[in-house]
A protein has these predicted regions:
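Intrinsically disordered terminal and processing segments
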Residues: 1-61, 65-126
Length: 126
């Protein structure tokens, strides 16, 4: 009876671990190959612009404030599933500093960086 219980627990733990790993890595290849387009800020009107990106656990929505054809603020409306404030802050700071979404990804958070950039790209499309 004890061996059976141990076997059931081992199988349950193995199944749970496999499902968790699948959930965390599903869509990773597609996200790594995601293209970030160009944004022409001269074509963007002043004001707050909302944009979203929807894919697996990286879905998010941001609001981008533009003043005099410059990005002045970026706010998260709906964050990615496993959000890290230091990642979003670093991405948004780079975008504001460079006035471009063509930035280097945050080390260890390449896919999350791309997800935020796609939302910003969506917000700034004319």
């Amino acid at each position: 009876m004890r061996k059976l219980l141990l076997l059931v627990l081992t199988l349950t733990l193995t199944l749970f671990s496999s499902c968790s790993l699948f959930t965390l890595t599903r869509g990773l290849d597609k996200m790594m190959n995601l293209h970030i387009g160009e944004v022409d800020l001269t074509a963007v009107d002043d004001g707050d612009h909302r944009g979203s990106f929807a894919f697996e656990r990286w879905s998010n929505t941001v609001e981008v404030t533009v003043h005099n054809h410059a990005i002045t603020a970026i706010r998260i409306i709906k964050d990615v599933k496993f959000a890290k404030a230091e990642v979003s802050s670093a991405v948004f700071e780079q975008v504001k500093t460079r006035q471009s979404i063509q930035i280097d990804a945050i080390s260890g958070s390449t896919v999350t960086t791309k997800a935020y950039l796609k939302s910003i790209e969506s917000a700034l499309q004319p």
